[in-house]
Amino acid sequence: TPIIKEFVGMPKENFQQAQTSSIVYYTESKDRIPQIIQWSMDSDRETIGKMVCELSNTDLREEIQHIEVPTLVLLESVFSFSKDKIEQQYAKLPKKELRYANKGLHFVMYDDFDWYIKQLKEFIL
């Protein structure tokens, strides 16, 4: 696909710049930014391209009804403004807990570590 070709064919410097530019949407933890960017740089770009395509084109709203185990979904704080839409997306997931962080972005485990650990412990115990 064009997206995969773009990821694979992009010069390393351009790819790194793209990752650096977009990271502001994923974490507020400035000290973690180099690590997260390095993960991207170390990843297989064809796999990243496939992942982007799959995430953009795959609707699992029907399939999730077959998940039988209790499921914890941790969401970044910005999604709390769209609770109705989020709950619609997970409506068929039978044993779910949707929890919204009070702060942070995609890497909520870095942005609000204490909240993240608390949610995991409460869910598991």
What label would you give each PLM region?
Residues T1-K5:
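Terminal domain-start segments
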Residues M10, V24-T27, Q88-L93, I124:
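Alpha-helix C-terminal capping segments
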